[in-house]
């Protein structure tokens, strides 16, 4: 009889560990302008290429953080992106160097325009359109990533 309760105890511990692993997504956030956003990370070519394509919406206080290997001139476009976005470019020091606000969705495929950074950038944060204005973001604002996000 004592083996049964210990087996149940083992199952409960195992389920708890499994659920703890699922909660790790809540550790992925950034702060800017006094606001915190849960983010998805795009840190390889495939993830960066797909970005927020084909999404019908994005919850409030959510975004996507694109991490590039090095600081460089960057340009993003809205190909197959159904929601308007603010595109915020940050340098190696995670300082805001360029903003493209209220960028409209584009369904023109390869005919969609690109939205370049005004200075070299390494990190790009895409938020729902209007967030940069709501926060009153100005160039030089600092991006603060969660400790769980792999940035140097």
Indicate residue ranges for each PLM-predicted region.
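N-terminal secretory signal peptides that target proteins for export/translocation
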Residues: 1-5
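General structural signal for secondary-structure boundaries
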Residues: 7-8, 44
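Bacterial N-terminal signal peptides
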Residues: 9-20
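Compact, glycine-rich, soluble single-domain proteins
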Residues: 22-152
């Amino acid at each position: 009889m004592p083996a049964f309760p210990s087996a149940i105890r083992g199952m409960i511990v195992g389920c708890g560990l499994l659920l703890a692993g699922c909660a790790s997504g809540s550790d992925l956030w950034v702060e800017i302008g006094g606001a915190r956003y849960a983010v998805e990370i795009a840190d390889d070519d495939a993830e960066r290429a797909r970005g927020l394509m084909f999404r019908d919406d994005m919850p409030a206080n959510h975004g996507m953080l694109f991490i590039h290997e090095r600081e460089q001139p960057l340009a993003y476009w809205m190909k197959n992106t159904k929601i308007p976005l603010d595109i915020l470019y940050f340098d190696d020091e995670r300082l805001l160097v360029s903003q493209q606000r209220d960028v409209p969705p584009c369904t023109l495929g390869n005919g969609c325009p690109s939205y370049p950074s005004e200075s070299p950038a390494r990190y790009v944060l895409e938020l729902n359109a209007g967030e940069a204005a709501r926060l009153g973001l100005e160039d030089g604002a600092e991006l603060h990533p969660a400790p769980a996000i792999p940035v140097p």
